[in-house]
Swiss-Prot record:
InterPro entries, A to Z: Helicase_ATP-bd, P-loop_NTPase, SEC_C_motif, SecA, SecA_CS, SecA_DEAD, SecA_motor_DEAD, SecA_preprotein_X-link_dom
Source organism, top-level taxon: Bacteria
Record-given protein name: Protein translocase subunit SecA
Gene: secA
Native organism: Xanthobacter autotrophicus (strain ATCC BAA-1158 / Py2)
Keywords from the UniProt entry: ATP-binding, Cell inner membrane, Cell membrane, Cytoplasm, Membrane, Metal-binding, Nucleotide-binding, Protein transport, Translocase, Translocation, Transport, Zinc
Subunit structure: Monomer and homodimer. Part of the essential Sec protein translocation apparatus which comprises SecA, SecYEG and auxiliary proteins SecDF-YajC and YidC.
NCBIfam families per record: PRK12904.1, secA
Enzyme class per UniProt: translocase
């Protein structure tokens, strides 16, 4: 109460922050007449003038007012749009590394051009981050007109570009890209073997569109690049056959935590079945030999109990395709990790694809913290303001709307059963259709959107068929859309038609059923989209007077339809249940009432809804029965809204804690990742790494000698045999250590010195034999390849450690501290192993002068994996090492030219290589069987 009174008297902190920007807005407005008088060339010349001022010592803050004024004038000329005063404020918030919360339709895309232009003047590159390729292309082409007008270059990073195209795009002043592509490029860059092959520049400044979706919803989802492992499809299919034989008493499902665990009875039953089938390697299911079997049994159980077809995934073209829980979009190529996707494929009886091994990974939380400066924009961020401040040090500022919102938000209607709820929804849709009011119906899953579609068909409505992407025949289809008795379904099944469906959702009488609208990125305009109609109806009409007249006619029609939609009350947003996140609900509401248009929103709930059921609908059901609530009646009260909001806050708090916990663990890996990646870049930049490998060799020899010759020990106490064996195995050195031990007055340091001298002589001889250039290249290649190989193994070990370290809590030990300690020990072991392997390989290496045939690299894939649901987002990630001819190495790395008829000449052959005999089979299936 007192807080509310204080806010009335002094204004909120947000109000005061916004007020603080007003003087600079006035200064920008004051420059407008002066800039209007400039020619296009003179306006463009200001860009170079700003850069000169920066070079002379001015800061970006010093240039904010004139730069923003220049962008405003440029936008008027290049785009026909003039940023409002509140949009200038949004731009200032983002320049100051904040998050601008701007309602739908307030022009976030245009706002971003203000801080983008200002920060691009520094010449370090600005990244504008979007959630999908469509938005990246659209915004880059649209706003690119303004940047080009002002003399800046623009690049686009989307799926399917090669490295040269990416390098050019990243070298541009402004680069539009998706969050996934940025993260994958960073990981791929740190798998390259030459500095010139990398595509990204240092991370300077990024503006993240739909920042809540990327930095909150996807925060706990690592980006993963992986390579394939051996095919185990038979194993998954075998495990899957036993899951349906379990009864409900054999496992416990926790919907709140989205987890499932077997009871003791279930474990015994599963153990008996697997033992009888010969799957177990030892008597007990929980013996160490069966750890892999237990893991896959648990994943198969999750697949059958926690994941629903048409809600979490769909089966399309004999593949299991994941559905994004936040947007309802289909994500072809994305795969669940750690065997879960294979378990789903076995469950659905489709082809089981092989598992993958992680080669590199990073979370969005850690990727975006690489930037010197980070900012964002969204329509809904305030509910997560604390998380943005805590993790990303970003302050959320609510930007006032240019025109006051006039949408009416009704209290929720709560029904006892889902059937009663849907009946009420159908009635409201009918009422809206009678007055030609456009309706947007939001659902939480494909399953529920299709259930509602079926109910509408039963009520006499016709569903538009979008199964054929080529089915659009322009004007005819648009006329059919306005019949008032047809509806469109927007979900993962019709992803290709998404832009068209959204563009027509504001036409009078339009009925659109949509899974979560988060991240759609397209405004629903009352009357429909004139641009979309022009694109469809006039696609075959060439430029000229006839086309101009046709365009004018369409725009007039759209304006007329807009007036009809306004008279009918604007867009009616109808929610069919509450989402776990208030933010998703607010995004759905925000689709209506853009730029001051009238609108309406209401949520219909039932006690069968997921959120209600998980958070105590039993008690509410008893209360409603006692109140005498009849069938078909709803209860409407602000108290219910508050109770639901509290339930949502609980879920949000739990999810925040989970994300925070993930970050604590990932920070451990992130610190190590930074060290390894920075070291890689240094090694790539070094032309000569001879000194580095020499230091490694000397340190290894010193440690090895100390292990077998204790300090101040007599020669009789030395482990001479152990040292002799170690020198032969690690360094390929056969030295008279036993004779040295018999010398009078010999000591450990002198032995160390002799071994170092002999090893250095051997390496000097190799350099003289092959030439310094070849030897330096070989040293660098071995060092980088070994580092990569050991790092991949290290990631796998840390991942395994993370899965089991929680059990140490039962021993009253803090799992996080245990993880940090173990991870440090593993990292120290990695560095020691790096010294050993690099030194051993260089001491043995022989170089064959023939040019080897080009060797195909193993296929690699990029995944976007959720550590809790296991989701992986995949994109092919070629990681070619460059076109430079590589000398052929023998020993541990490669082999000389092989004679198919002489196995003696084959040397060491990889298990998955083609057999040198020429059979076409893999080595492990041919001569390797006898090796």
């Amino acid at each position: 109460m007192l807080g509310g009174l204080a806010r009335k008297l002094f204004g909120s902190a947000n109000d005061r922050r916004v007020k603080g920007y007003r003087p600079r807005v006035q200064a920008i407005n004051a420059l407008e007449p002066e800039l209007e008088a400039l020619s296009d060339e003179a306006l463009r010349a200001r860009t170079e003038d700003f850069r000169r001022q920066l070079a002379e010592g001015k800061t970006l803050d010093d240039l904010l007012v004139p730069a923003f004024a220049t962008v405003r004038e440029g936008a008027k000329r290049a785009l026909g749009m003039r940023p409002f005063d509140v949009q200038l404020i949004g731009g200032m918030v983002m320049h100051e590394a904040g998050i601008a919360e701007m309602k739908t339709g307030e022009g976030k895309t245009l706002v971003a051009t203000l801080p983008v232009y200002l920060n691009a003047l520094a010449g370090k590159g600005v990244h504008v981050v979007t959630v999908n390729d469509y938005l990246a292309k659209r915004d880059a082409e649209w706003m690119g007109r303004l940047y080009r007008f002002l003399g800046l270059t623009t690049g686009i990073i989307v799926h399917g570009l090669d490295d040269d195209e990416r390098r050019v795009a990243y070298a541009s002043d402004v680069t539009y890209a998706t969050n996934n592509e940025l993260g994958f490029d960073y990981l791929r860059d740190n798998m390259k073997y030459e500095r010139g092959q990398m595509v990204q520049r240092p991370h300077f400044y990024a503006i993240v569109d739909e920042v809540d979706s990327i930095l909150i919803d996807e925060a706990r989802t690592p980006l993963i690049i992986s390579g394939p492992l051996d095919d185990r499809s038979d194993f998954y299919n075998t495990i899957d056959t036993y899951i349906p034989r379990l009864g409900k008493e054999d496992y416990e499902v926790d919907e709140k935590q989205r987890s499932v665990s077997m009871t003791e009875a279930g474990m015994e039953k599963m153990e008996q079945m697997l033992s009888a089938a010969g799957v177990l390697k030892s008597a007990s299911l929980y013996d160490i030999e069966n750890v892999s079997v237990v893991h896959h049994v648990n994943q198969a159980l999750r697949a059958h109990t926690l994941f629903q077809r048409d809600k979490d995934y769909i089966v399309r073209n004999d593949e299991v395709v994941i559905i994004d829980e936040f947007t309802g979009r289909m994500m072809p190529g994305r795969r669940y990790s750690e065997g879960l996707h294979q378990a789903l494929e076995a469950k659905e009886r489709v082809q089981v694809q092989p598992e993958n091994q992680t080669l590199a990974s990073i979370t969005f939380q850690n990727y975006f913290r690489l930037y010197e400066k980070l900012s964002g924009m969204t329509g809904t961020a305030n509910t997560e303001a604390a998380e943005f401040a805590d993790i990303y040090k970003l302050e959320v500022v609510e930007i006032p709307t240019n025109v006051q919102i006039s949408r009416i938000d009704d209290d929720d209607e709560v029904y006892r059963t889902a059937g009663e709820k849907y009946a009420a929804i159908i009635e409201l849709i009918k009422e809206c259709a009678e007055r030609s009011q456009p309706v947007l119906v939001g659902t939480t899953s494909i399953e529920k959107s299709e259930l509602l579609a079926e109910l509408l068909k039963q009520a006499g409505f016709r569903q538009k068929d979008f199964s054929d992407p080529t089915a659009f025949n322009g004007r005819e289809l648009l006329i059919n859309d306005r019949s008032g008795k047809s509806f469109a379904v927007l979900n993962a099944r019709y992803h290709e038609q998404e832009a068209y469906i959204v563009s027509q959702a504001g036409v009078p009488g339009a009925i659109t059923i949509a899974t979560n609208m988060a991240g759609r990125g397209t405004d629903i305009k009352l009357g429909g989209s004139a641009d979309m109609r022009i694109e469809i109806e006039l696609k075959d009409l060439p430029e000229g007077a006839e086309r101009a007249a046709a365009e004018a006619k369409i725009r007039a029609e759209v304006e007329e339809l807009k007036q009809k939609a306004l008279e009918a009350g604007g867009l009616y947003v109808l929610g069919t249940e509450r989402h776990e996140s208030r933010r998703i609900d607010n995004q759905l509401r925000g689709r209506s009432g853009r730029q001051g248009d009238p609108g309406h929103s209401k949520f219909f709930l039932s006690l069968d809804d997921d959120l209600m059921r998980i958070f105590g609908s039993d008690r509410l059901d008893g209360m409603l029965q006692r109140l005498g609530l009849k069938e078909g009646e709803a209860i409407i009260h602000p108290w219910i809204n508050k109770a639901l909001e509290k339930a949502q806050q609980k879920v949000e708090a739990r999810n925040y804690d989970m994300r925070k916990n993930v970050l604590k663990y990932d920070d451990v890996l992130n610190d190590q990742r930074k060290v390894v990646f920075e070291q890689r870049v240094e090694l790539m930049n070094d032309e000569d790494v001879a000194e580095t490998v020499e230091d490694m060799r000397h340190a290894l020899i010193t440690e090895t000698v100390a292990k077998f010759i204790p300090e101040n020990a007599y020669p009789e106490q030395w482990d001479v045999d152990g040292l002799d064996t170690a020198l032969k195995e690690m360094l390929a050195l056969d030295l008279p250590v036993k004779d040295w031990a018999k010398e009078e007055g010999i000591a450990g340091p002198e032995v160390t010195e002799r071994i170092i001298r002999r090893a250095d002589e051997l390496m000097a001889a190799k350099t003289a034999q092959y030439g310094p250039d070849i030897m330096r290249y070989v040293e660098k290649s071995i060092l980088l390849q070994t580092l990569d190989h050991l790092w991949r193994e290290h990631i796998g070990m840390l991942d395994h450690l993370r899965q089991v370290v929680g059990l140490r809590g039962y021993a009253q030990r803090d799992p996080l501290n245990e993880y940090k300690s173990e991870a440090f020990n593993l990292f120290s072991a990695l560095l020691n192993r790096l010294r050993e392997v690099v030194t051993a390989q260089l001491m043995r290496v022989e170089i064959v002068t023939q040019q080897p045939p080009p060797e195909e690299l193993p296929p690699m894939e990029a995944h976007h994996a959720d550590p809790f649901t296991g989701e992986d987002e995949l994109a092919f990630a070629g990681a070619a090492l460059g076109s430079r001819p590589q000398p052929l190495l023998s020993g541990d790395l490669a082999v000389a030219e092989r004679d198919p008829n002489d196995p003696e000449s084959w040397g060491k052959v990889g298990r998955n290589e083609a057999c040198p005999c020429g059979s076409g089979k893999k080595y492990k299936h041919c001569h390797g069987r006898f090796a």
